[in-house]
Amino acid sequence: MAISASAGAAPVITIDGPTASGKGTIAHRVAKQLGWDVLDSGALYRLTALAALRRGLPATDEPAVAAVAQALDVRFDGPHVYLEGRDAGHEIRQEEVGNYASCIAAYPGVRQALLERQRAFRQPPGLVADGRDMGTVVFPDASLKIFLVADVEARAQRRCKQLIKKGISANLDDLLRDMRERDARDTQRAVAPLAPAADAHVLDSSGLTIEQTVQAVLDFWRA
């Protein structure tokens, strides 16, 4: 492992990357192999987006959306996630919610409101955290930092298959356009832009299977 975590803190592996780079799947599989907890930080932004949408708030109303993030009523129970007492696992994966989440993720008030919630997931024996700023902002002292990249066309095809498998209608051209727009927002935002940490291992998963990518992360950890 490349770096030691802060003294007394549970070890963390961060897996950052753009939309549909496979970071969520990889994080869950690595966590399962190690017997660690997993943090899907994107789910918190999507839950904030869904809560704001339920209240009819436009994504441009930064103060109101930040207030929603501050008071977010969520509960994670294994593979299930509950928003205000209702299972929201299916709803937060809809593209409308994802696009809204990408917009509000640029707001400093939203990011600050969710920062400590994310850090609270750090518990023994360890945590695998996936997102966009896990290694740069949320867990800068992580023991291992991975930055997953993949060709945008490959990512759009991957997301299309995921949505169809879940019974959600999807159009590849629309997904490709949305993904390019989301990539631009994520990399160009003023607060915590999407970029690999200076000490991150950049891993291109375009030509790798899920199993090969998981093994590559585990190899980095055990090196």
UniProtKB/Swiss-Prot annotation:
InterPro entries: Cytidylate_kin (IPR003136), Cytidylate_kinase_dom (IPR011994), P-loop_NTPase (IPR027417)
GO cellular component, one term: cytosol
Keywords: ATP-binding, Cytoplasm, Kinase, Nucleotide-binding, Transferase
Catalytic activity: CMP + ATP = CDP + ADP; dCMP + ATP = dCDP + ADP
Any one Gene Ontology BP term: nucleobase-containing small molecule interconversion
The keyword Transport appears for this protein: no
UniProt KW Kinase keyword: yes
Pfam families the UniProt entry points to: Cytidylate_kin
Residues involved in ATP binding: 17-25
Enzyme Commission numbers on file: 2.7.4.25
Gene3D superfamilies per UniProt: P-loop containing nucleotide triphosphate hydrolases
Subcellular location, record wording: Cytoplasm
Molecular function, one GO term: dCMP kinase activity
Enzyme class: transferase
Chief site of localization: cytoplasm
CDD domains, sorted: CMPK
Family, per entry: Belongs to the cytidylate kinase family. Type 1 subfamily.
Protein name: Cytidylate kinase
Species of the source: Bordetella parapertussis (strain 12822 / ATCC BAA-587 / NCTC 13253)
